[in-house]
């Protein structure tokens, strides 16, 4: 019987989350998941997103089961979220991944053709003063130069939809993004331009105010799920993304 401690008070046993209370261990339930799992960083989605998702159901849960986790805010938030989700796979390739591993995977798999497409696009953004990275795409003269920038990490290379396309093909995962723009009151699925693949696992991210990514999870069967199969993607997400199932 495998037992994994998340904190001193929370553990996973037989794919179920338990917490320590009054000298005993109790399963975490639908009504209290947000209170208990707050200890390890999980919080509810914003009320706007909860309302939007609840509208997809005839009888939504009284306590929303969607949560989000801040996996890091040092400029590598996108890569932190993806690595955290992948570490949940029972696959030796992805165990103990971190953000640098994700960046390295990109540099190992990017082709010359992809490099040329990416750098041309970045230069167009630079010309229109819409390039948000701290480096100059005109200083990049080879694929190796671009890979060096990608590997620097932090705020030097945040990641974008081109990088997401690469990650999906490299990792064989779908990446769905929920926009949470409180400044402009936008709460919609983010158009990643990537085709959904039902044979892939799926990672769901929350994109907050155009500057920060968080990992989205769903509490089900006494466990917080944040890496989904085609069958386990929450119905509300299936509806708003029009996924055929």
Regions found by a protein language model. Give the residues of each.
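Papain-like cysteine protease catalytic cores
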Residues: 35-188
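Intrinsic-disorder/low-complexity regions
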Residues: 3, 7-8, 13-14, 75, ...
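Compositionally biased, intrinsically disordered low-complexity regions enriched in proline and serine
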Residues: 6, 20-21, 31-35, 43, ...
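Deubiquitinase catalytic domains
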Residues: 147-245
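Non-catalytic, low-structured ubiquitin/UBL-interacting segments
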Residues: 1-71, 87, 220-221, 233, ...
